[in-house]
């Protein structure tokens, strides 16, 4: 259960792949802390056990993730497939015709099966027999993930409900529960009774667990004594603290930024990742086959994969590498990195094009629901993508992801804001996921952000350019459009109009600020406002008010040069000036 807040259907479609993320996390964390010890002797080695049903097997993501698990030789993962042939709409023969075990064998999994349904048609939940099959699998396939198919009957032995589809998604009902109690020899009128034999068994299991825990503690204590440096790293990771040198790494990088130079924020992001990776050994990640485009490659890092996976492009593969490759599997990438976070003390990230974040969305939503600090890196964030056309040009995505509660959407204006966004995301000891939304095209490094980003970005929105006295209009913008707001403010100033520019890298971070700060940035008395963003304007109306004007894109993109697309769709300084004047005029007319 990787969600823990309610109905299984919420999470089961991702649980299979998340379990694979747990296995990734175990191996990488062991490589950080105890790489030389044979894995069976390491206190950081553990096995991952997952239970799934037909619904999980039917979901496409399970196949995607299973393929990766076999490629990674995740021998510490065992999945028990409860094959009761029932789902909400009835017998799975309607929809699940293939031989599942052969499919998983083709991926590279070890498979076996065991049946609680006896040859004579009787039913016996033979746990000892199942344990023997699992032990056999452990011995036969130490370097393969394992799928054990268990043939079972749903709701056995409940009278009238055994092997009935209604048992899958509905209550058994008082009559059926009473019948089950009677069948098992209990008083049908008595509730919440725990049999003494069951209680004694549970206590015996608890005692066994305590003994195993004691043995592990002894192994861990011996490791700690023998590895003081690694123990210090473990303590830091467990506490969620950043390493010494984190701030300096970012400060040194920012010192290389040249005001006025065009730098794509995806490129700045790649520089930041490499700078902080040098001092954060727990940081690892990659992309869904777009590493070179997303700038998510860690220079000089080994690839997380068995040595035999090495290629001409990626010759350095080992089981403890920190460069991840997911293939074209965005949803799987999101769920595996979720699982890594849940199962280890490491910090993963995953990148793709912003347009393809749609395929990852369900994993992102679940991370927000679980309050885990996954890091999603989404580049190529607007119609400026250009020639690939509207299929690759996100326009509604910023609005739709901002609508997810507890997801922090971050769209920096330039290299300085990008560096400061990463600084704050990690420094705030975040328990929420963050999405870095980044440009394909170069954007100028602004003198204004050089002076103000360090204090401003962490507030979510801040005054980038101001005027003396009360402004006539406030120009709000995010990402690559901040440059046009700054240019428009200069034009307006030349015409005697006082314009304030507010950079808004993260609406979520801005909403965390107190009322006094919000009022200082967006004073209620200034009703003339403009928002500038290369996407639908929906999220901006709460800041625009009654007289504000959005400069936005309310249609799908265009096939053509990216810069020309921006012009053709009205994302220009000239259009911002027009919108500012229109907003001011409406305010004046209303007086």
Please give the residue ranges for each predicted region:
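Single conserved hydrophobic/aromatic residue that forms the stacking wall/gate
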Residues: 1-7, 11
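Thiamine diphosphate
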Residues: 4-5, 28-30, 37-45, 58, ...
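A short, small-residue-rich loop immediately preceding and capping a beta-strand
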Residues: 8, 36, 44-59, 77-78, ...
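Short glycine/serine/threonine-rich phosphate/pyrophosphate-binding segments
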Residues: 15-19, 58-64, 331-335, 358-361, ...
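Terminal amphipathic helices with adjacent charged low-complexity linkers/tails
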Residues: 152-158, 162-244
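Non-catalytic terminal/interface segments that mediate subunit docking, oligomerization
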Residues: 218-373, 430, 452-463, 469-471, ...
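Flexible, small-/acidic-enriched active-site or ligand-binding loops
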Residues: 392-395
């Amino acid at each position: 259960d990787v969600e823990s807040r309610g109905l299984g259907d919420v999470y089961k479609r991702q649980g299979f792949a998340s379990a694979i993320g747990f296995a990734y996390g175990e191996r990488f964390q062991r490589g950080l802390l105890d790489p030389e010890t044979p894995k069976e002797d390491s206190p950081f080695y553990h096995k991952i056990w997952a239970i799934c049903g037909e619904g999980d097997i039917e979901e496409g993501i399970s196949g995607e993730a299973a393929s990766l698990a076999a490629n990674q030789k995740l021998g510490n993962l065992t999945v028990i497939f409860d094959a009761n042939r029932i789902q909400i709409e009835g017998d799975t023969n309607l929809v699940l015709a293939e031989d599942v075990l052969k499919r998983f064998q083709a991926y590279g999994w070890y498979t076996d099966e065991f049946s609680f349904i006896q040859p004579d048609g009787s039913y016996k939940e033979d746990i000892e027999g199942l344990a023997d099959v699992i032990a056999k699998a452990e011995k036969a396939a130490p370097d393969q993930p394992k799928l054990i198919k268990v043939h079972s009957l749903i709701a056995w032995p409940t009278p009238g409900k055994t092997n009935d589809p209604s048992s899958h998604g509905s209550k058994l009902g008082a009559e059926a529960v009473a019948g089950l109690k009677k069948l098992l020899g209990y008083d049908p009128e008595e509730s919440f009774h725990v049999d003494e034999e069951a209680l004694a068994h549970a206590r015996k299991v608890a005692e066994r667990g305590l003994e195993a825990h004691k043995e592990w503690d002894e192994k861990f204590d011996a490791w700690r004594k023998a590895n003081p440096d690694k123990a210090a790293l473990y303590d830091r990771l467990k506490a969620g603290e950043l390493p010494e040198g984190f701030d300096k790494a970012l400060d040194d990088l920012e010192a290389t930024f040249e005001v006025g130079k065009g730098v794509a924020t995806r490129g700045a992001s790649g520089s930041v990742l490499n700078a902080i990776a040098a001092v954060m050994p727990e940081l690892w990640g990659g992309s869904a086959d777009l590493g070179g485009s997303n700038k998510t490659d860690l220079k000089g890092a080994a690839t997380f994969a068995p040595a035999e996976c090495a290629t001409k492009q990626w010759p350095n593969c080992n089981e403890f590498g920190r460069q991840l490759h997911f293939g074209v599997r965005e949803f799987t990438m999101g769920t595996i990195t979720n699982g890594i976070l849940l199962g280890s003390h490491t910090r993963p990230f995953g990148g793709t094009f912003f347009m393809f974040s749609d395929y990852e969305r369900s994993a992102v939503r679940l991370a927000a629901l679980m309050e885990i600090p996954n890091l999603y890196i989404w580049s190529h964030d607007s119609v400026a993508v250009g020639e690939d056309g509207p299929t690759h040009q996100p326009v509604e995505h910023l609005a739709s992801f901002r609508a997810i509660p507890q997801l922090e959407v971050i769209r920096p204006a330039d290299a300085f804001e990008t560096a400061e966004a990463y600084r704050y995301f990690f420094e705030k000891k975040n328990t929420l996921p963050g999405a870095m939304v980044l440009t394909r095209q170069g954007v100028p490094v602004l003198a204004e952000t050089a002076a103000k980003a360090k204090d401003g970005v962490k507030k979510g929105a801040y005054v980038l350019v101001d005027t003396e006295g009360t402004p006539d209009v406030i120009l709000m913008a995010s990402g690559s459009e901040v440059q046009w707001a700054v240019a428009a403010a200069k034009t307006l100033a030349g015409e005697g109009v006082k314009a304030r520019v507010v950079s808004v890298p993260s609406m979520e971070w801005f909403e965390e600020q107190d009322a006094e700060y919000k009022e200082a940035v967006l004073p209620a008395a200034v009703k003339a406002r403009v928002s500038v963003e290369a996407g639908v304007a929906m999220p901006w109306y709460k800041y625009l008010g009654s007289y504000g004007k959005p400069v936005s894109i309310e249609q799908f993109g265009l096939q053509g040069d990216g810069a020309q697309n921006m012009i053709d769709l009205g994302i220009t300084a000239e259009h911002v000036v027009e919108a500012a004047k229109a907003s001011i005029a409406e305010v004046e007319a209303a007086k």
